[in-house]
């Protein structure tokens, strides 16, 4: 019955059969991405409601168009505890993982390339976090000097990376291999098909990278700098759906103010953060989540204390009312 209803709805809405609809999706990665994004929002809403939260969808484009979009409502949902009467909400943004992280531009099409990626994560150099922090600060300083040269007397936002978790990569692969030679032997023993796009798409390649993808051209409110990434202040909590790498619509959460911002524009986030790397047959298929990422929404809010916002009625999506 459900299948017949789906077939009828697709025929009425799109004028095609179910198989034609699916073929169109397969041949249009962008369309597939939009549907996955919509599903992520659907499952995130259900997840939060099951945990005792009131969830109100934020309209993508309010009456009046983009000019009427509030800077305080740049996410997908307003969220607060069920039963609360306080006008105090957290704006939640839902995103998915980058679908082509492993194979775009033939990134990991042989074991040598994968080795160069994994070695620094499996055998980090002593003081590497300090080194990453310093490199980020050097980039920041250069960007600040260049910006102030054209904006005399104006203030460039401060550099606010966390020294404990600097940069966009948060995973730790130490202990999986005895030494670099052991890693080399492991990777070189894998069959060639482990480094193909097909294997990576099916999550059975040499690695599965949990990398965020947040393309969103935004201009900084203070600097006017434009980057293809969200602003740190756009939302209160970022929720990432891990489906593309774990096969389940499950979420991890982060406070954007706890993530390392773009080193060249402190008002922006990075477009991509690496949450973890799964190694088939070597590391359990479950991701290991560590700060600034959290497995639970409640845990993220409790430990990072994001700032609450007032609900703006003009930003609420009433389509389902």
Which residues does each PLM region occupy?
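Extended hydrophobic/aromatic segments used for targeting, binding, or gating
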Residues: 73-76, 99-100
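Active-site beta-strand-loop-beta-strand hairpin of nuclease catalytic cores
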Residues: 71, 78-94
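Interdomain/boundary linker segments immediately adjacent to catalytic/signaling cores
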Residues: 1-56, 60-70, 81-83, 102-104, ...
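Catalytic cores of nucleic-acid endonucleases
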Residues: 88, 95-247
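A short catalytic or substrate-binding loop motif that flags glycine-/basic-rich loops and adjacent residues
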Residues: 68-72, 231-232
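Residue-level detector of flexible, active-site-proximal loop/helix-junction positions
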Residues: 62, 98, 258
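C-terminal/domain-terminus segments
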Residues: 245-321
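Conserved hydrophobic/aromatic positions in well-ordered beta-strands
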Residues: 78, 239-241, 252
């Amino acid at each position: 019955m459900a299948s017949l209803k789906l077939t009828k709805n697709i025929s009425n809405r799109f004028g095609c059969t179910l198989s034609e609809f699916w073929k169109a999706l397969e041949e249009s990665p962008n369309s597939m991405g939009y549907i996955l994004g919509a599903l992520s929002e659907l499952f995130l809403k259900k997840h939060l409601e099951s945990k005792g939260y009131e969830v109100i969808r934020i309209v993508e484009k309010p009456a009046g168009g983009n000019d009427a979009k509030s800077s305080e409502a740049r996410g997908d949902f307003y969220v607060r505890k069920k039963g609360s009467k306080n006008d105090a909400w957290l704006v939640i943004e839902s995103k998915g993982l980058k679908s082509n992280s492993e194979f775009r531009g033939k990134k990991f099409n042989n074991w040598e390339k994968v080795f160069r990626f994994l070695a620094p994560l499996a055998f980090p150099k002593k003081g590497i976090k300090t080194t990453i922090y310093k490199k980020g600060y050097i980039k920041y300083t250069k960007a600040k000097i260049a910006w102030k040269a054209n904006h005399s007397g104006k203030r460039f936002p401060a550099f606010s990376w966390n020294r404990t978790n600097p940069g966009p990569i948060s995973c730790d692969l130490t202990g999986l291999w005895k030494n670099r030679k052991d890693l080399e032997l492991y990777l070189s023993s894998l069959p060639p098909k482990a480094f193909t796009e097909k294997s990576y798409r099916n999550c059975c390649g040499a690695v599965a990278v949990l990398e965020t993808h947040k393309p969103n051209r935004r201009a900084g409110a203070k600097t006017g700098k434009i980057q293809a990434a969200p602003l740190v202040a756009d939302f209160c909590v970022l929720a990432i759906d891990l489906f593309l790498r774990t096969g389940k619509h499950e979420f991890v959460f982060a406070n954007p103010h706890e993530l390392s911002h773009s080193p060249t524009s402190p008002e922006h986030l990075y477009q991509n953060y690496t949450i973890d790397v799964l190694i088939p047959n070597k590391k359990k298929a479950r991701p290991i989540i560590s700060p600034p990422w959290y497995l639970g929404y409640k845990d993220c809010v409790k430990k990072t204390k994001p700032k609450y916002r007032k609900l703006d009625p003009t930003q609420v999506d009433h389509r389902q009312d």
